[in-house]
């Protein structure tokens, strides 16, 4: 189900049709006035579809499968929109095996695999884009922080944080915040500054 939240009256509106196939643990993003859903699972298999909803046809629109990314069946992962490009992937294929990282632009129907992903990089559960550094900062399922720089196209291994069940990264006023969650231990919350992490 896709809903719209309006802050004016603090309510949710059920204005959109459901996706063509039920799924959860997808990654979502907005690009050029459209909503996109990538991957996810129906609890029996992971998906590689990219589904689009065009907001310019909101009253009569529908979700359309615009692409299937080869070898990208995944649940979880990340999606970033930077200028005119979308970077997505790094979710779980199956049994903890990490998916690739892909880039696309324009119609988002063709996706290119970004090469040279470090073998040690685990399944990514969250990340942020640092505009000043032109880098993605991501955290994998082992609590390891990774940086991917768009200018140099290089991966850098950063700090190892505590191991938790899942992670969420946020960015506010140039600071990166990490929330680690687990059902068997207390949640952890920290500020991460790449300047300290050389």
Where are these regions (language model features)?
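Kelch-like beta-propeller repeat domains
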Residues: 1-198
């Amino acid at each position: 189900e896709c809903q719209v939240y309006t802050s004016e009256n603090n309510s949710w509106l059920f204005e959109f049709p459901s996706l063509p196939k039920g799924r959860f643990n997808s990654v979502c993003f907005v690009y050029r006035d459209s909503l996109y859903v990538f991957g996810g699972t129906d609890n029996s298999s992971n998906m590689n579809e990219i589904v689009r909803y065009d907001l310019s046809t909101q009253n009569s629109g529908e979700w359309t499968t615009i692409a299937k990314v080869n070898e990208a069946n995944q649940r979880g992962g990340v999606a970033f929109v930077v200028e005119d490009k979308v970077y997505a992937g790094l979710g779980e294929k199956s049994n903890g095996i990490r998916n690739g990282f892909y880039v696309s632009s324009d119609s988002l129907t063709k996706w290119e695999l970004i090469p040279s992903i470090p073998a040690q990089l685990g399944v990514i559960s969250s990340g942020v884009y640092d505009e000043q550094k032109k880098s993605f900062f991501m955290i994998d399922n082992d609590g390891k922080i990774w940086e991917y720089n768009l200018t140099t196209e290089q991966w850098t291994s950063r700090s190892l944080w505590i191991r938790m069940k899942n992670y969420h990264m946020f960015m506010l006023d140039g600071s990166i915040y990490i929330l680690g969650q687990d059902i068997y231990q207390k949640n952890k919350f920290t500020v991460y500054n790449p300047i300290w992490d050389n």
